[in-house]
């Protein structure tokens, strides 16, 4: 008799996606992050659901409701810090996942890649709105500054900002709608993840060499299920250590001060995972120019397949491109550092130089290096 997992209409889909799925035999640990992101999303939806049961999205009570969760709800402090630090873990995995895609040429699967970019934007929007909900000082002023950027759009900008705010400033209407969207968007993310996997399973996974691996495939279970569980244990160890030993390490102390529209914090900044984009935004003196640079810093990923001029897909055998890739990583870390610093000399010029280098490496140096490497192959 045929195994039920291969015949049952529902189990068959799961079987073909996670059990009998043919996978390349040489996938490294860099291929673990997809499953880790799935776990992060599940953790965020579950902890968020329980937090939403106790949270109130009203400017008068939002801050106190978060305090109530931490002090009075059974394990409320654990839920709150798992959710806050789970977001950080989500973005760490997300950036490593994108980095893996850039390094090994996974962006050549353009449908999967484009859905991934859409996922990135959706997750960023969700995280931004979630940061507003505790209604601390940084929540309020972060929401004010970031939504205000839309006023740079010619003609409709000011009306658009007031439409999003639901008034003439960030207030009760803004908080209520942000809570509604913050609750809704993770389910959209989950739906997009399904589409992401659908397109991935149309082509099959890439592998570190970038060479087609059709002739040497192994079943996903047990080989990669075990490998994913190991990665999961490492990630959960890191997350639980962060939550239990240093839960406020990645947060901003200003967010423990209730939101006050009459008192501006000395340094308004977003969460650490947005600092690189924030640094690029600030490095351009013009408001509209800064907003465009901010959007393009992420949208540039969409043209990566067009900028791929190398005859080899992966960077595994391309040492010059590898050097540029790691330089890009260093620049992104520099931008993250600059985004958290005040707007003064020498941080301004460092941020501007790093921003120029970020775009130059992706748009100019990487394609030129690929052409040079193609030429060297002929020797």
From Swiss-Prot:
The reply to whether Transport figures as a keyword in the UniProt entry is yes
Residues annotated as binding a ubiquinone are 201
Output the superkingdom of the source species: Eukaryota
Keywords from the UniProt entry: Electron transport, Heme, Iron, Membrane, Metal-binding, Mitochondrion, Mitochondrion inner membrane, Respiratory chain, Transmembrane, Transmembrane helix, Transport, Ubiquinone
Per the UniProt entry, what are the Gene Ontology biological process annotations, in alphabetical order?
Answer: mitochondrial electron transport, ubiquinol to cytochrome c
Keyword Transmembrane included in the entry's annotation:
yes
Q: Which GO terms describe its molecular function?
A: metal ion binding; ubiquinol-cytochrome-c reductase activity
**What are its cofactors?**
heme b
State a single Pfam family of this protein. Cytochrome_B
* Coiled-coil parts of chain: none
Q: Which InterPro entries match?
A: Cyt_b/b6_C, Cyt_b/b6_C_sf, Cyt_b/b6_N, Cytb/b6-like_sf, Cytochrome_b, Cytochrome_b_C_euk/bac, Cytochrome_b_N_euk/bac, Di-haem_cyt_TM
Topology term for the membrane: Multi-pass membrane protein
Which positions, given as ranges, span the membrane? 33-53, 77-98, 113-133, 178-198, 226-246, 288-308, 320-340, 347-367
Give the binding site residues for heme b b566: 97, 196
The record's GO CC annotations read: mitochondrial inner membrane; respiratory chain complex III
Q: Which cysteines are joined by disulfide bonds?
A: none
Subunit notes for this chain? The cytochrome bc1 complex contains 11 subunits: 3 respiratory subunits (MT-CYB, CYC1 and UQCRFS1), 2 core proteins (UQCRC1 and UQCRC2) and 6 low-molecular weight proteins (UQCRH/QCR6, UQCRB/QCR7, UQCRQ/QCR8, UQCR10/QCR9, UQCR11/QCR10 and a cleavage product of UQCRFS1). This cytochrome bc1 complex then forms a dimer.
Write out the function statement from the record.
Answer: Component of the ubiquinol-cytochrome c reductase complex (complex III or cytochrome b-c1 complex) that is part of the mitochondrial respiratory chain. The b-c1 complex mediates electron transfer from ubiquinol to cytochrome c. Contributes to the generation of a proton gradient across the mitochondrial membrane that is then used for ATP synthesis.
Q: Which family does it belong to?
A: Belongs to the cytochrome b family.
Q: What else is known?
A: Heme 1 (or BL or b562) is low-potential and absorbs at about 562 nm, and heme 2 (or BH or b566) is high-potential and absorbs at about 566 nm.
This protein is called Cytochrome b
Species: Glyphonycteris sylvestris
Gene symbol? MT-CYB
